[in-house]
Design a protein with these regions (language model features):
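PLP-dependent amino-acid enzyme catalytic core
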Residues: 1-359
Length: 359
C-alpha cells in the first residue's frame, strides 16, 4: 500500500515513510491510495476468528511488505492485549468500552500500534527520532505509555494549561526518561498549531528528525479500525441488522477510522458525530459552511478541538461530495449541562453499570 499527500497528490510514500515522517509537504495528511475491501465471508463470520486474527486481517494490506507477517501479528497481539467489551445498556443501545487499556483511553490502541511499528522501523537506525505530539487529554498519556523507554525515540508532548484533568496531567508528566511534557498557555488548537509549525520548519525537522503521534499519522489513525471490527463481532452475536454508530468526536480521527472500515465492508446504517460545545462539524453538516473556531474549554476536555485535522480525510473518503457525506453522517453538539444530565440519567436508570476505582 502506498499513501499520497492530500495537499500534493504527487507526493507518494510507503507505510514506513508515512509512519516515520508523520505528514507530507505543506502539512498535508497522508491517505491510502486504495481502499481494499474486506472479504464478505470474513465480515459475516467474525465469530470464527480470534481478535488477533481480526486485527491482523484489518491491518495487513495497509502495512504491506514493510513489516513481516509474523512481526505484524505480534504487534497487533500486544496492541489489543486487554478487554474491549461491547456492553448492552438497554434494548436499543450498546456501548463499546475502550477504557480498559493501560492509560484508560481509547487511544491506547492507536498509540500502542504506532509505537511498536516505529520501534521496529527504527531498530537499526543511528539517528534518534523525536515524536512531537499535541494532546487535549487522552492522546498524551497513551503516547507517553506507548513510547516510554523505547531506545532511539524521544517524545515531546504539548498540552494546554488547566485544560487536562489531574490524572491526565500525571500520565504526561510523571514518567520521565524519554518523555518530555510541555505545558502551553493556550488551547489544544494552539498546541496543534505549534506542532504543525515545527513540522513545516525544515531546519527543525532535520535537526530533530520529527514525527507525529497524533491521529494525523497513518500508523495512529488506521489501527482504530480494529475495534470497530471487534465491536461488530460481538454485535453479531445478538443482532442481525447493521448498527447506527455514534462516536464522541474531537479531532475526528476515531470516526474517520470507523467510516473507513465501513467503506471497506463493515456494516453500519449511519454514523453520528457526537461533539461537545465545539460544534464546527455539526454546524458544517447543517450549513455547508466549514468555519474553524478557537476551541472552547468544556468538561469533556479531550474533545475540545475547534479545527479538526482529520475532517479532510473524511471528505476524501466521500470524494469531497457534501451530499454523500451528509447521507452517511449526522452531527450533534451537546453542552456541559446536557452532558452531566445524561451521565446522571444513565447511572440512575441503567442496571448494568460499573464504577472503576483506580488506587
Amino acid at each position: 500500500m502506498r499513501y499520497y499527500n492530500l495537499k500534493d497528490h504527487e507526493e507518494i510514500v510507503d507505510f514506513k515513510t508515512a509512519a516515520i515522517q508523520g505528514q507530507g509537504k505543506d502539512k498535508g495528511l497522508f491517505f491510502p491510495e486504495r481502499l481494499l475491501l474486506f472479504d464478505k465471508e470474513f465480515i459475516q463470520n467474525l465469530h470464527q476468528y480470534s481478535d488477533v486474527e481480526i486485527a491482523y486481517q484489518c491491518m495487513k494490506d495497509f502495512v504491506s511488505d514493510k513489516i513481516p507477517s509474523e512481526t505484524l501479528r505480534k504487534i497487533v497481539s500486544e496492541t489489543i492485549n486487554f478487554a474491549i467489551p461491547l456492553r448492552k445498556i438497554n434494548d436499543d443501545i450498546s456501548v463499546l468500552e475502550l477504557f480498559h487499556g493501560p492509560t484508560l483511553a481509547f487511544k491506547d490502541i492507536g498509540a500502542g500500534f504506532m509505537s511498536r511499528c516505529l520501534s521496529y522501523f527504527l531498530q537499526d537506525q543511528q539517528k534518534k527520532v523525536t515524536v512531537l505530539v499535541a494532546t487535549s487529554g487522552d492522546t498524551g498519556g497513551a503516547v507517553a505509555h506507548g513510547f516510554y523507554d523505547l531506545p532511539g525515540i524521544d517524545v515531546v508532548i504539548l498540552y494546554p494549561k488547566n485544560r487536562v484533568s489531574p490524572v491526565q496531567e500525571k500520565q504526561l508528566t510523571a514518567l520521565g526518561k524519554n518523555i518530555y511534557a510541555l505545558e502551553v498557555n493556550g488551547s489544544f488548537d494552539d498546541c496543534q498549531s505549534l506542532v504543525k509549525q515545527a513540522f513545516s520548519d525544515e531546519e527543525t525537522n532535520e535537526q530533530l528528525f520529527l514525527t507525529s503521534a497524533n491521529s494525523i499519522n497513518v500508523a495512529r489513525w488506521l489501527p482504530q479500525q480494529i475495534y470497530y471490527l471487534l465491536a461488530l463481532k460481538q454485535w453479531q452475536q445478538t443482532e442481525s441488522k447493521a448498527p447506527v454508530i455514534c462516536v464522541p468526536s474531537g479531532n475526528f480521527g476515531n470516526i474517520c477510522a470507523g467510516i473507513l472500515a465501513h467503506l471497506r465492508g463493515l456494516p453500519a446504517e449511519h454514523f453520528i458525530a457526537a461533539c461537545n460545545a465545539n460544534n464546527v462539524i455539526p454546524e458544517y453538516l447543517k450549513t455547508k459552511n466549514f468555519s474553524p473556531k478557537k476551541a472552547m474549554a468544556t468538561l469533556s476536555n479531550a474533545m475540545d478541538v475547534g479545527d479538526p485535522s482529520n475532517f479532510v480525510r473524511i471528505m476524501e473518503l466521500f470524494n469531497n461530495e457534501f451530499d454523500l457525506l451528509k447521507n452517511k453522517i449526522s452531527g450533534y453538539s451537546i453542552d456541559d449541562e446536557k452532558t452531566m444530565q445524561t451521565i446522571s440519567e444513565i447511572i440512575t436508570n441503567t442496571i448494568i453499570f460499573s464504577i472503576r476505582i483506580v488506587l
